[in-house]
Amino acid sequence: MSRMAEQQLYIHGGYTSATSGRTFETINPANGNVLATVQAAGREDVDRAVKSAQQGQKIWAAMTAMERSRILRRAVDILRERNDELAKLETLDTGKAYSETSTVDIVTGADVLEYYAGLIPALEGSQIPLRETSFVYTRREPLGVVAGIGAWNYPIQIALWKSAPALAAGNAMIFKPSEVTPLTALKLAEIYSEAGLPDGVFNVLPGGGAETGQYLTEHPGIAKVSFTGGVASGKKVMANSAASSLKEVTMELGGKSPLIVFDDADLDLAADIAMMANFFSSGQVCTNGTRVFVPAKCKAAFEQKILARVERIRAGDVFDPQTNFGPLVSFPHRDNVLRYIAKGKEEGARVLCGGDVLKGDGFDNGAWVAPTVFTDCRDEMTIVREEIFGPVMSLLTYESEDEVIRRANDTDYGLAAGIVTADLNRAHRVMHQLEAGICWINTWGESPAEMPVGGYKHSGIGRENGVMTLQSYTQVKSIQVEMAKFQSIF
């Protein structure tokens, strides 16, 4: 693909040049080619976007629920019509295999938008009788202008996960995509405008987190920030949001999630789940089950089943429909993952497979890392304690149920957890003791629109998807009505 034209900001229904004068490049990680130069939003651009959003939000909130629902459903239709085009762009920007982006990223994002479009008419208040002459009624009103700050691993899906409930509740959103993968969020803005969204209701400001992101979190005109990213960045977002105007926040942060295989589990099923929990999207999924706990007596058999499945991984041309494994999203991220792999070797973990970059024709110019499995891991190892966000699985053994529960919970994270067992009594008993917000029994990874997702502990605050997320983009107004004559004590 030839280099794209310079990408601008999207404010008030159209593209506009940034006033900051700063630009950055977005790179195809499969081959190192520059895809485009992108303009970065500065403080004046954030001010412009907020003013635009304030204007658009008033128009949007004044529409009827059915009018808003129809516009968002029209956007869903356009997303599905343009699925292949958007998936190709997502593959170029992220490096993910087209077999994945064409069936997951836009598809699931559109599902979430459709879900919230259908919920808009159901967003209602309540009536509370006090006595014969008085009652209270409540209204759910939009917050106003909110900000979404996305991560680089699921660019358009995250933009939809954040914008769908916000817009459904009558808000306007200013969205900052990751500077690593900014392209499809701009296309989403085009689609919203084409669907009939009023100008300003969805503005997109590319730029770095330390500049554009900070300006958004500090801006007094923004009522809420929804952030997806790392824990350290999330803490800064929370601090800025609180210091500026006590903004509400939703935080979807990191994870180091446990996948527990019990001794009664079908080991073929468990190995299939472990593969998906570690190597889907080349391991760049926040919910990955990277700490795989296996009964000591099953270790050797499980290792062989994992090795057999690693042989089925097909890395290569990301547009080949048979390819199911792509490069990492960027060269700096590749180097960081390689540092973790080196640390694992240094601390005594045994490399079962992988452990290096992929080499050879088609790989040398890209950010490729081989699918890596470490065994003989211990809980104190760096690769077991810290989020790597790459194709690195750690196998650990255990002896008892109580032991594995304790060790699974021994982490600052609490995003996800999984169990593989034939005993559903055990599954529920153990799951109720695991400290994680997104949990799976005999499966892994699905996050449907109806399912609230979010973490415990350092993995986040608040939830995305589900009814409660729609409500989190509203504020409740309570109104008392008195029909009898008011009696003053004065």
From Swiss-Prot:
Q: What EC number(s) would the UniProt record show? A: 1.2.1.8
Site description Seems to be a necessary countercharge to the potassium cations, residues in chain: E248
Q: Which residues form a coiled coil?
A: none
Q: In the record, which positions carry Cysteine sulfenic acid (-SOH)? A: C286
Enumerate the Pfam families for this protein.
Aldedh (PF00171)
Sites binding K(+) 2 sit at L246, K457, G460
Comment on bound cofactor? Binds 2 potassium ions per subunit.
| Molecular function via GO | betaine-aldehyde dehydrogenase (NAD+) activity; metal ion binding
Q: Name one GO biological process term.
A: glycine betaine biosynthetic process from choline
This enzyme catalyses: betaine aldehyde + NAD(+) + H2O = glycine betaine + NADH + 2 H(+)
Active site per UniProt: K162 (charge relay system), E252 (proton acceptor), C286 (nucleophile), E464 (charge relay system)
Q: Which UniProt keywords apply?
A: Metal-binding, NAD, NADP, Oxidation, Oxidoreductase, Potassium
Disulphide-bridged cysteine pairs: none
Query: What family, per the record?
Result: Belongs to the aldehyde dehydrogenase family.
Quote the function comment for this protein. Involved in the biosynthesis of the osmoprotectant glycine betaine. Catalyzes the irreversible oxidation of betaine aldehyde to the corresponding acid.
Under the subunit heading, UniProt states: Dimer of dimers.
Q: What is this protein called?
A: Betaine aldehyde dehydrogenase
